[in-house]
Swiss-Prot record:
Comment block on domains: The N-terminal domain interacts with the head of the 30S subunit; the C-terminal domain interacts with the body and contacts protein S4. The interaction surface between S4 and S5 is involved in control of translational fidelity.
Protein's name in the database: Small ribosomal subunit protein uS5
Every S5 DRBM domain range: 53-116
Family label: Belongs to the universal ribosomal protein uS5 family.
Endpoints of the signal sequence: none
Keywords: Ribonucleoprotein, Ribosomal protein, RNA-binding, rRNA-binding
Subunit structure and binding partners: Part of the 30S ribosomal subunit. Contacts proteins S4 and S8.
Region (Disordered): 1-48
One Gene Ontology term of the molecular function aspect: rRNA binding
Keyword Transmembrane: no
Species of the source: Rhodococcus erythropolis (strain PR4 / NBRC 100887)
Length: 223
């Protein structure tokens, strides 16, 4: 009987400690839940700030560096960022982890933003860009044509907000060369006003009638 009393007595404090420990665990669980909510809220705010930009990861490569102790591996990411309204940039990031490499690429792309001259949803005139052994040709297209491009070229054009265009890639099919050739072509575009001012002519003498109509429709002056 004393043994039973001792066991009962021992179980009494244990039973008392059980609810306390359960309460503590629940409290810890509540604290952890609150922490997750705060972190999720922070991520939600960042997502809202970044929602205005379109981000496309073109390619991710693993590279290695031979050192005295062996090999060190890292990752590189080629990223395109644009607002879908004529603003676009290209970035190349390198880090030990893929997410960090992508983030570095996004930051570099935002630093290299440039404006693409557009009329309605296409480019102003045919143009060709080159980078290393890559060559990309771009031609304006009528409304409803869509983006006739593939791979890296399409990523750049869609981030820039170009909806109707014809393209052809020649030479190297390396994604980095193709992307930089596309960017070189877009940077070579000129506005009709710039060409007219340089030649000393009027806008009607320089720009085709179809281009002027498309521009007027885009501006809403022609219904």
């Amino acid at each position: 009987m004393p043994g039973r009393q001792r066991r009962d007595g021992g179980s009494g404090p244990a039973g008392q400690n059980g609810p306390n420990s359960g309460d503590n665990s629940n409290a810890r669980g509540d604290n952890r839940g609150g922490g997750r909510d705060r972190r999720d809220g922070g991520r939600g705010g960042n997502a809202a700030e970044k929602s205005q930009f379109i981000e496309r990861v073109v390619t991710i490569n693993r590279v290695s560096k031979v050192v005295k102790g062996g090999r060190r591996f890292s990752f590189t990411a080629l990223v395109i960022v644009g607002d879908g309204n004529g603003l676009v940039g290209v970035g190349y990031g390198k880090a030990k982890e893929v997410p960090a490499a992508i983030q570095k690429g996004v930051e570099e792309a935002r630093k290299s933003f440039f404006r693409v001259p557009m009329i309605a949803n296409t480019i102003t005139h045919p143009v060709q860009g080159e980078a290393a052994a890559g060559i990309v040709m771009l031609r304006p297209a009528s409304p409803g044509t869509g983006v006739i491009a593939g791979g890296a070229v399409r990523a750049v054009l869609e981030c820039a907000g170009i909806a109707d265009i014809l393209s052809k890639s020649l030479g190297s099919d390396n994604a980095i060369n193709v992307v930089h050739a596309t960017v070189a072509a877009l940077k070579g575009l000129q506005r009709p006003e710039e060409v007219a001012a340089r030649r000393g002519l009027t806008l009607e003498e320089v720009a085709p009638a179809g281009m002027l109509r498309a521009r007027a429709q885009a501006a809403g002056s022609v219904k």
